Amino acid sequence: MTLLEGSVGVEDLVLLEPLEQESLIRNLQLRYEKKEIYTYIGNVLVSVNPYQQLPIYDLEFVAKYRDYTFYELKPHIYALANMAYQSLRDRDRDQCILITGESGAGKTEASKLVMSYVAAVCGKGEQVNSVKEQLLQSNPVLEAFGNAKTIRNNNSSRFGKYMDIEFDFKGFPLGGVITNYLLEKSRVVKQLEGERNFHIFYQLLAGADAQLLKALKLERDTGGYAYLNPDTSRVDGMDDDANFKVLQSAMTVIGFSDEEIRQVLEVAALVLKLGNVELINEFQANGVPASGIRDGRGVQEIGELVGLNSVELERALCSRTMETAKEKVVTTLNVIQAQYARDALAKNIYSRLFNWLVNRINESIKVGTGEKRKVMGVLDIYGFEILEDNSFEQFVINYCNEKLQQVFIEMTLKEEQEEYKREGIPWVKVEYFDNGIICNLIEHNQRGILAMLDEECLRPGVVSDSTFLAKLNQLFSKHSHYESKVTQNAQRQYDHSMGLSCFRICHYAGKVTYNVNSFIDKNNDLLFRDLSQAMWKARHPLLRSLFPEGDPKQASLKRPPTAGAQFKSSVTTLMKNLYSKNPNYIRCIKPNEHQQRGHFSFELVSVQAQYLGLLENVRVRRAGYAYRQAYGSFLERYRLLSRSTWPRWNGGDQEGVEKVLGELSMSSEELAFGKTKIFIRSPKTLFYLEEQRRLRLQQLATLIQKTYRGWRCRTHYQLMRKSQIVISSWFRGNMQKKHYRKMKASALLIQAFVRGWKARKNYRKYFRSGAALILSNFIYKSMVQKFLLGLKNDLPSPSILDKKWPSAPYKYFNTANHELQRLFHQWKCKKFRDQLSPKQVEVLREKLCASELFKGKKASYPQSVPIPFHGDYIGLQRNPKLQKLKGGEEGPILMAETVVKVNRGNAKTSSRILLLTKGHVIITDMKNPQAKTVIPLNSLAGVSVTSFKDGLFSLHLSEISSVGSKGEFLLVSEHVIELLTKICRATLDATQMQLPVTVTEEFSVKFKEGSLTVKVIQGPGGGGTGKLSFKKKGSRCLEVTVQ
């Protein structure tokens, strides 16, 4: 049973029954499998990463959720964003949206969805749209430079981001401020197996054109850079080439100039090239170990790229200057130290470039002073991380998550308590785990782990990670949330998973083991002064600005604050900022470790739900009353349960709610009436209300159906009755009208006859007998004479092509007019024929024969109509040698041309000469005129030809023919229309019989060995050229393709 009809599982976990960890996870799983990834815990949104694009984020959904309140539609991130925005705009309360969860749980995507929704609903206008576009386009820039592929997430944020979006009093965006936290700069020089460096390096190499790569002195192959993992250069579902173009467009929209974009890419290229600087062992003259650069070309290219003296850079990488108030001492660095210096420089350049980018974006989107602003903060910060090898970065990341969990617990309880106080409802204390003891363990000013780390970094003498661990073991040996090998041994606990250089903290999310190796180094975060000064001397404006401490005039011997101290200060500031705003929570959950769509790991989600405190959050929400709703909304939903409030209620909302609940006889212990809301203690009571509402809806539906059916039947009856009356009246009227018209026509006819009879009777005495016939004949002859004289004057031209003919003036002349037209056309044709010479007559007869044979049957016929039939296409009359081919044959040569003979055995072709006389068809070889075949026309049984534009045809012989011992002939002619026309006419003249011509795409040719089936098909070109290609298909089939 659910709160809303048709929902999947329970949409609000506050209403879950029974309330247990397993049922909570099962409900999330059920909804996830139905692609319902959002679930509420009161006003907290739980989001399970679907690892796929869902069709629930288009403009239709934006419009839907902006018009409804939080609980009126299905759970959605737009509902939470809309609630936060409306609270900011209408109630003037600053908001913050806290997005938390593991790496890969979808926090970055959630923050982008929140920003896109707010941008879509917060007003329009040229200036407003410009501000919204700049805020949205900051995401691609920060993702390119701050996100990377990790083992668990292909687009993991490796920095923390908090954005304050500022609005005016109308809710229109004015600008914003971005704050970043602890970029994971160690990733610049080293990544775990299966991980990538920051996206920008791969986008630059994949998306930059050849000219830009040449200017940056880079090559496209990622395998040529020491700082990039070659095995993971590509990521499924990520197009680095396209993303680079998106990055360039985003930087332009934000306000970066072309020169600034070029300088940013040059600094990124400098980091890549620094990784390829290879250092080797060298020794000074006194035998002291030193270092040098194997190939100076790389350093030289770096110098050319950023305007840096390569000699000074090499000196800064391979030596160090120790400076006190009185003297300077230069010491050489061995290879390990030089490599450390090179990597430290690369990390610092990239980290400072990232900070510069954030500041540059802030300059573009910042709001002018003097305006009153409302603020909505969106926090997208690294999720809780538990890796196989956890170092300093994981320690501070998890510390930040501890602080956020503390904020969540305190502000959730605070909000719940304040709502009860506002409504006058007694508050019931809820037991929950307070992680303040863990936060205090890490951040205490005198005895916290961070304080001990700073103290160890500043302590004179030999300082190492092991001395730091020893101090922690001494201070926290009895702390309930701290463990190490030493403390376990003291308590006689034996854990083989705990290393000697490790300590463990029992976080709210679970136990995490940290390896102290490099803690001191990463906390110091020192960069040798020689390297800062070398970078400051570069002629590159951006690179120079990143190292202000390199300026000798601003040189200071004061030690900079440690990384841990800076991060602790930033987190403290962030917490103060969050406490000053109204919180909105999005708890992101990763459903599986392999980023697979549709796969839900019950165990993994259980662990996340446990450390996110989802069950405790539900219990807090249900501490006093599981469900609460404004009187107006509650009455609107349930007023149908009382006859007093249904269908109309004119009283107050609270009074109406009391009427409804009073008639249901519900226990007073289950209800509490606040000032503006009704509170219900247990979900069972709410489910009872929903069940009663469902039953009542069925009753009302039945009533509505009954009423509707009755109304429809009455309406139909009334309409039919009205229609019958209208039809009857029209029918009767029409019948009367027809009867009246018939009676009137009859009366007029009788009157006409009577008047005629009377007129004839009265005037008969004045006329002679037969006068009418004489007059009518005279009139008719006059009309005929007029028609013929008019026709004589309007006769068309004597051209047989002119089809015009004047129409008859009267209908009874139509027959005569058509006959005259026919006679005139015959006369014109005779006159035309009398003018023709015998040769022209013969030509036209051949064309007429061709038309009868091929018109509408062969595609090449229309092209042959305007072309005269020449007959001789080989120059027979001018070549005596060719005339000998005729032999003893008498009479003229009707047709002479070169044809192609198709070999029946291998489908190969060869040229032949074909002669047509009045009695024979002669086929002979051009090279051997003696080898000829003479076919009498009376031996021909028929001709087969295709309907395409080709010249292929077959001469079929009669069965009694003695000619062609090898069989019938398959030939190709360029003048097939003319040739076959002449053969048919010659055969008719010689045998007085018509030669059959078959137009078909498949015919049989008989040979000595048997028959061969010829199949003609049209090629992909549509047969426009008429070219043929032959292909043998077995021994009995030949396939011909017309190109």
Curated annotation (Swiss-Prot):
Keyword Phosphoprotein on entry: yes
GO molecular function: actin filament binding; ATP binding; calmodulin binding; microfilament motor activity
Keywords in alphabetical order: Actin-binding, ATP-binding, Calmodulin-binding, Motor protein, Myosin, Nucleotide-binding, Phosphoprotein, Repeat
Segments forming domain IQ: 697-719, 720-742, 743-772
Cited InterPro entries: IQ_motif_EF-hand-BS, Kinesin_motor_dom_sf, Myosin_head_motor_dom-like, Myosin_TH1, MYSc_Myo1, P-loop_NTPase
Cross-referenced CDD domains: IQCD, MYSc_Myo1
Any one Gene Ontology BP term: endocytosis
PTM field: Phosphorylated by ALPK1.
Positions with a binding annotation for ATP: 101-108
Domain TH1: 858-1042
Similarity section: Belongs to the TRAFAC class myosin-kinesin ATPase superfamily. Myosin family.
Function (record text): Involved in directing the movement of organelles along actin filaments.
Protein name, UniProt field: Unconventional myosin-Ia
Species assigned in the record: Bos taurus
Lineage, highest ranks first: Eukaryota, Metazoa, Chordata, Craniata, Vertebrata
